[in-house]
């Protein structure tokens, strides 16, 4: 018969060692390459099958999951697939879901807050030119829904949080990578 104390102690030690191992992995979650590029941890995001959302990925496809705060990107016959952490809308009321597509790509986007955004925050400017303080970051993908975009951000604290007025935000280096791969007409789904 197994001694209850040994069983409890063994279970506790096993759990503690797994916890310690996960802490070590978490500490390694953000690394820098030799060129200084930051590598962000995406291991906590669940894999998605493109077939559950799109008919084809030949010209690319983007799925933004607002619950897990990540963006899935697929392209080509070889099933190129990447997951990126995102910022998502502040509230469900600001979140639009469904299918849309990319209608415009802009490097160095300017920004005009909507009337409702300025109502919520009267201190917002009417217009902001491209630049380091622009909340749209370095690149923007305009969607067929008015005023909705997938864009970069210079405020990296927003990534992984509910922090936008409806758009999906990415680290600037991630939006630049996607920007260079997608085409006008690429399908997008927000869930």
Over which residues does each language-model region extend?
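Short, cationic motifs built from Arg/Lys/His that form the positively charged side of catalytic pockets
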Residues: 4-5, 70, 169
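Short, flexible active-site-adjacent loop segments at beta-strand->alpha-helix junctions, enriched
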Residues: 13, 68, 106, 147, ...
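Cell wall/extracellular polymer interaction/catalysis modules
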Residues: 29-116, 127-132, 139
């Amino acid at each position: 018969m197994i001694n209850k104390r040994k069983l409890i102690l063994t279970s506790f030690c096993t759990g503690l060692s797994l916890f310690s191992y996960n802490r070590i992995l978490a500490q390694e979650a953000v690394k820098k390459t030799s060129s200084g590029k930051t590598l962000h941890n995406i291991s906590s995001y669940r894999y998605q099958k493109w077939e559950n959302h799109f008919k084809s990925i030949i010209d690319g496809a983007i799925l933004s999951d607002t619950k897990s705060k990540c963006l899935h990107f697929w392209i080509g016959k070889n099933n190129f697939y990447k997951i990126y952490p995102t910022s998502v809308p502040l509230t469900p009321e600001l979140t639009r879901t469904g299918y849309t597509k990319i209608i415009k790509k802009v490097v160095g986007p300017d920004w005009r807050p909507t009337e409702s955004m300025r109502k919520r925050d009267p201190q917002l400017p009417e217009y902001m030119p491209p630049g380091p303080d622009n909340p749209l970051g370095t690149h923007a993908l305009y969607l067929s829904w008015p005023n909705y975009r997938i864009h970069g951000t210079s405020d990296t604290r927003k990534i992984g949080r509910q922090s936008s007025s409806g758009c999906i935000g990415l680290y600037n280096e991630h939006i630049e990578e996607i920007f260079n791969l997608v085409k006008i007409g690429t399908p997008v789904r927000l869930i």
